[in-house]
C-alpha cells in the first residue's frame, strides 16, 4: 500500500469524524423538533434526553456497518483502490448532503442517504471497471452489485414510508376522535391508557425490534423472549 492510500485512510478518518458530527446532529433534530416546538419541558432537559437517546442508539447499532461492508455491493469483485474510492465518495457526499439538508431545515434520513450513496458509488465504479474490460458487457454489473440485498433494502425503505404515513394518519385520526379539542375535559384514565399504549409501543420498537441484529441481542434474548 503506497503513500496515496495512507493519505486516503487519514482523510477517511477525518471525514468519518465530521460525518459523525453532521449525522448525529441530523438524528438529534429528530429528537428535538417536536419537543422544543411544543415546549413540553426545558430545553436543557430535552438536550440531555436526546443525547442519551443518540448515545444508546449508536452503541447498539451494527446493521449499518454490515450494509456498508457487503450489503450493497460484492466486495470480492472490487480491488482495494476501488473500495477506497467508493468510501471516499460516500463520505464526502454524505457530509455535503446532510449538512445542506440540516442548514435548510429539511428532513432527511442518515440511513437512506448512506444506502443510496453506497449504491451510486458502487454502480459508478462498476461501470468504470466494465468499460475497461472488453470481455465484460453492461449486464456484468449484476456481478458487482448485491442486487438481491440492495433491492430488499430499497423496497423496505419505500415501504416504510407508506406504512409510516398510513399508520401515523390512522393513529392521529383515532387520537383526534378520543380527545377532540377538549382533552382537558376527558377523564384522566383515558390519558393514562393512551399514554401507556404509546409508551409500550415505542419501548417495544426500541428494545425488541431495535436490538435485533446487534451484538448485544444474544446476551439479552432470553430475558426479552
Stretch-by-stretch model annotation:
Residues 1-225:
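Alpha-helical transmembrane segments and immediately membrane-proximal extracytoplasmic
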Amino acid at each position: 500500500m503506497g503513500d496515496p492510500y495512507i493519505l486516503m485512510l487519514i482523510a477517511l478518518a477525518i471525514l468519518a469524524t465530521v460525518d459523525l458530527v453532521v449525522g448525529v446532529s441530523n438524528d438529534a433534530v429528530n429528537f428535538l423538533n417536536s419537543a422544543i416546538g411544543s415546549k413540553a419541558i426545558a430545553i436543557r432537559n430535552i438536550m440531555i434526553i436526546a443525547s442519551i437517546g443518540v448515545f444508546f442508539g449508536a452503541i447498539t447499532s451494527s446493521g449499518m456497518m454490515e450494509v456498508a461492508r457487503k450489503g450493497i455491493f460484492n466486495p470480492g469483485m472490487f480491488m482495494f483502490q476501488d473500495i477506497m474510492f467508493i468510501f471516499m465518495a460516500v463520505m464526502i457526499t454524505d457530509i455535503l448532503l446532510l449538512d445542506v439538508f440540516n442548514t435548510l431545515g429539511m428532513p432527511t434520513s442518515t440511513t437512506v442517504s448512506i444506502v443510496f450513496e453506497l449504491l451510486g458509488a458502487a454502480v459508478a465504479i462498476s461501470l468504470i471497471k466494465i468499460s475497461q474490460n472488453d470481455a465484460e458487457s453492461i449486464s456484468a454489473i449484476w456481478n458487482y452489485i448485491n442486487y438481491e440485498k440492495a433491492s430488499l433494502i430499497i423496497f423496505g425503505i419505500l415501504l416504510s414510508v407508506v406504512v409510516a404515513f398510513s399508520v401515523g394518519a390512522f393513529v392521529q385520526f383515532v387520537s383526534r376522535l378520543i380527545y377532540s379539542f377538549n382533552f382537558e375535559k376527558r377523564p384522566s384514565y383515558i390519558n393514562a391508557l393512551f399514554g401507556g399504549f404509546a409508551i409500550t409501543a415505542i419501548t417495544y420498537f426500541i428494545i425488541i425490534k431495535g436490538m435485533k441484529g446487534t451484538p448485544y441481542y444474544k446476551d439479552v434474548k432470553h430475558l426479552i423472549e
